[in-house]
Amino acid sequence: MRLKAKLFASLLLVSSVLSAQDFKLTESGYFKNAGVDVMAYDDIYPEGHQGGVCIIMNGNRVATNGDIRLEATPGQWQPVPKQLKRTVGENSIDVTLCFPDSSRHMTGFNPMIYPDLVFNYQVKVEAVGDHIEVSVDLDKPIPEKFIGKVGFNLEFFPGSLFGKPWIMDNKSGIYPQQPNAPLLETTSNIHHPGDFYTGNGSLANAKQLIGEGYSPIVADDVIAEPYAVGRKFTSQPDDAYNKVTIESLTGDLKLYDGRMNHNNGWFVLRSEIQPGATKGAVKWIITPDVVKEWMYKPVVQTSQIGYHVNQPKEVVIERDVRDNRNLPVELLRIDANETRIVKTLVTEEWGKFLRYNYLKADFSDVTEEGLYQVKYGESLSPIFRIASDVFDRGVWQPVLEYFLPVQMCHMRVNEKYRVWHDRCHMDDALMAPAHSHIDGYDQQPNLSKYKAGEIVPGVNIGGWHDAGDFDLRIESQAGEAYILSMAYEAFKPEIDATAIDQINRVTEIHQADGKNDLLQQIENGALTVVNSYLALGRLYRGIICNGLRQYVLLGDAAAMTDGVIGNEDDRWIYTENNPSRELSTAANLAATARTMKGYNDTLSTHCLNIAKQIFETTEANERLVMTKVHAAAELYLTTQEDVYKDYILKNQETIIAQIANAAWYLARVEQQFAQLKDKKAKAFSKAFRKALPQAKAQLDKQVAETPYGIPYRPHIWGAGWDIQSFGYRHYFLVNAYPEIFDAKPVFCALNFVLGCHPGSNQASFASGVGAQSATVGYGLNRADWSYIPGGVISGTALIRPDFPELLTFPFLWQQTEYVLGGGSSHYMFLVLAAQQILNK
């Protein structure tokens, strides 16, 4: 009897150990086993390496985009499947998908060319003990001409694999730093184009997309030979925290280097669909190593630069939900001779956000200047300063000192020995043909006095390259000038660290010219908008390269075109009929007119006249009333004319209903209305102020949703830009109504950008600012894994449903891209706002 009891106990023990090692489907809709998570078709952005089957191991995303693809190593321009249905079962996830996605064939924001191939398929992702099984059923066999092209791919993140080992059956290797020959030539799918255009949206020009020679939209004609072929593959066999083994039961596995035909590619493991295969066309067994004792190391989140002595100071501690330890939170002071504990902080349990639990601790009462660090168990925050001059040097200044000069178009940009880029795009621009293009550009017919291909003169001046794409978009140009104008009006910072010569088209970084750099940059933005308007007789949509290979250029912007006006490499200029953007631009130009007055009076006059003309000629339906109110507000502040005051007063009811969104740009107007003798203006002022507490209550509710003190609802794209924009808008409320609106959200938004944000990567989003910052960014020098000081990246993104991620990788635009029309300029504004508020 005793023997039976011992045997039964042993069986129970073995059973519990085995069950503890099993993958289980969580309430969040993904498979989990200790520190290993396997998501399945929750993300919806495969062209951005977020989709299909995704493997996260101990806080690192190691592989993603497990799905059927039509090429061995596709890039962002290749066809992606359309997801039709996703069903979460007891311990499996079943997904139905199809090719093609007709809505993306030859049309849309970035058109794709789908081959003449139509099929549906089902993917089943199932937890089976200590591994995940992936099986694919097709509704029909793959046609012979596509055999070898269609397969199941899984992409491995290259940034953490360089120099790391892999094993395929009996062959082994090291992931290389760069892609290596030999090349493999294949017949491209482009030779079998489909006809799936639905008639919705403008049609792209296939010949223009494909171009001549290498084309990013042709991904499969020349690729790298696979590094290995076999049935069982192990990545990082030496590292239990990142080791994963994949076995194919239906065909060979092949390991490819996707960087051979796309510089931004990933390593790809794939198995091809075999001839005649339908049910069980793919069957993989994925076995990640599971380290049972692994627990997410607490992350101590603070600003990477530190805090003004008068600033609210909080530390946020991010912990594993299983971590119930109550460890002391210690504030350390670092002096020349010692590091000592100056205070043990009182912690507040904030609760769960995304996948982590959060603690918070306040140390606002610490005002002695010096170097500090926060310690929680074995985890440390970055070293930061507390000082009254913490924002005074090298914090907001790099935006004007480096980033905006580097982004200047139609310029040569020098920095002493260095040339950031040569004089570029002096052959701008030809009138765009009427068809759908790339990056959202879509020329409609009969919107210009110029015919397609005709030279549009006078537009080769001013502007900034938008992000890493080199185009000039109306919202990025006028919007940037607007934010900079708001900064100049609010703070009037003195800075002269660049010499900008618009006549000879040369910018010299770290060479003073006696002019305020902020005003010079406002001028640069206004020049492109005004000159394009004068040339076209209307606003441009933007200027962009005419070919896809030009669009993906990595390197000197001057290499995109030859600078000779009127030939086939010239960029195209677009127009559009978009009342919303036109009215927004009117608001932008009206404000820019104020800052340019006395600096460049001719440009100021043009800005104001264009804004007035747009306001007068653009009808606003119900959906656009508030956009026109914004334009009226800026025009009133510039001119004090009754026509704009009357438009605002006429729409009082709508404004009050939209107070939460409109108060920031109407606050300055309301304060002027309150001083007028006009009864209607005074009544407006009274109603406006009465509605503000409602907006405050709405804001308080949103702020309470996160441990970071700001409205923050993560999504696929990094949220840094949105949070900076929020802080920028909130400043105007704090400045006008300090008795209602607290300044703390301004500081919280700034701290978020400077490092106090979710995830293990604590880097400041502002490149070159702070102890640790984003020094690999999606800018013009991304191919060199480098950065532009003062550029502000998109920031921590969300791997759905709950994993915050910020990779050190230059080719993920949704995490590390720089932009114009916000981003860095909003960040600069926030720093100046904090400086002003705290120094009062």
For the regions a protein language model found, what residue spans apply to each?
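Beta-strand-rich N-terminal accessory domains
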Residues: Q21-E90, T186-I223
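Aromatic (Trp/Tyr) and acidic
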Residues: L203-Y241, I305, K313-G377, V390, ...
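Polysaccharide-binding surfaces and accessory modules of carbohydrate-active proteins
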Residues: D22-L25, K140-D238
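Low-complexity, Pro/Ser/Thr- and charge-rich linker/hinge segments at domain boundaries
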Residues: S160-I167, E293-P312, S381-V419
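Beta-strand-rich recognition/accessory modules
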Residues: Y214-E293, A834
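Bacterial Sec-dependent N-terminal signal peptides
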Residues: M1-Q21
